[in-house]
Amino acid sequence: QAGGDFGQTGFAVRLYEGIPALVLTLRSVQLRCQFKRLRTHLILVSTIILLSAGSEAESARKYRDLCSIVYPSDATIEWECRTLRAGESLEKLFGEHWIDVVRFNRIDRRHAQAGRSIKVPKQLYDLQAFTPLPLSYPTAELDEQFVLIDLSEQFLGAYEYGSLRFAMPIASGEVKNPTPVGEFRLTAAHRAHESCLYMIEGTNRPYPMNYALRFYINREGVSYWIHGRDVPGYPASHGCIGLYDELMQKEQYGIPNEPELNDAKRLFEWVLGGEAEDDRLIQLPQGPRVYITGRAPR
């Protein structure tokens, strides 16, 4: 499977080759997910692909040296490489600037573990108001809302009439499951979305994709979303765009103790103009335009 998530797309699904041509209309989210998991297993058997291979690849890359990842904006900040030691925390090391440091490294606190090497600016104040994205985007000056995603920088920008309102780091698709590039539009929002394909590592619990905003459905019916997820400091998703969601991490892993990073929620509520009243899938007939450009670092 190419990546992304089968998600709640709300249309009929045709069974794969070798199975009688049958179209099932699945009305409940739970039944749709069960069917898609079964469909995925059949695909995996027929092509001899093991889902565990993806998990092993993720585990192998989890501790990669962040100093070796090159972003174009690295040249604008003087920094040095530092390896985190046992007992150290970003809060203790950088005080009130810890959030600036994690954003600069495109990493969350759960993944800032002992043994990881991170980029540390020689002057922490250089990171104040840091963003690798343009403050103005003339192409979107007529758009009330516009989303720019730069894969080369691993950053997302939310624009209002061409002016940058806020920016946030992302985790895009890894090498084998790249995030699609081009022009898209947000077509659906789902506050309590979850994956129908992937589980929380080491469990049988579906991976949460909270505050999900759908921007693309490919020909195979695979949905691509912007949503909350782990942000390990490098492209690691199956094609979706991941944003900080420390509350989800607290619920699933027990850390961090005091969640603060909530970029997924912030973007979600910006698009909707406030909090969602419930957990139903919300269609966005005229959602904001999304432009994805660049190439993710390897």
Regions found by a protein language model. Name each.
Residues 41-50:
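Bacterial N-terminal signal peptides
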Residues 51-61:
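Bacterial Sec-dependent signal peptides at the C-terminal "C-region" and cleavage site
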Residues 61, 197-298:
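Exported/periplasmic cell-wall-interacting domains
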Residues 65-97:
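Primarily a LysM-type cell-wall glycan-binding module
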Residues 67-74, 120-144:
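Intrinsically disordered, low-complexity Ser/Thr-rich linker and spacer segments
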Residues 85-112, 166-167:
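LysM (lysin motif) carbohydrate-binding repeats in extracellular/periplasmic proteins that recognize
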Residues 130-234, 288, 292-296:
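Gly/Pro-biased beta-strand-loop elements
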